Amino acid sequence: MLRRIAVIAASAVTLACGTLPASAAASPVHAFGIPGVYGVRAWGSYQHTGAKIRVTVCVKDAARDVYGAAAAGLAFDSGYRHHDDVSVTAIGDGHMQCRALVTRYLGHLVVEALSGYRNGKVRHHSTPEWIY
């Protein structure tokens, strides 16, 4: 009987020590859409991870007559003095790509999408959108 109580107590202590405090729980993933242009579908997400943020940007070339699609996200500090960027391209109808960035700049996130011609010139670009 004492052995059972000792095992139960040890199990309870192990479980209590193994759980994370509420402050260490992962924050939710926030999805966003990037304003599109003809033939381009773009989207992304961000998630706070402690003192940093993980930004993911995805793009899909969705039209046969669009040669390539691109999307970019810029994460700034609160004063717009420093930034990190993540960009992604997809070439060919139906192709999709995603890229991620972990940055310490938590102030603002701005995203934009564009489509391009075969010669590398920009065909159309969306209006930049402030996510936060």
Predicted feature residues:
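N-terminal prepro-regions of secreted/extracellular proteins
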Residues: 1-41
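Post-signal peptide N-terminal regions of Sec-secreted extracellular proteins
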Residues: 25-132
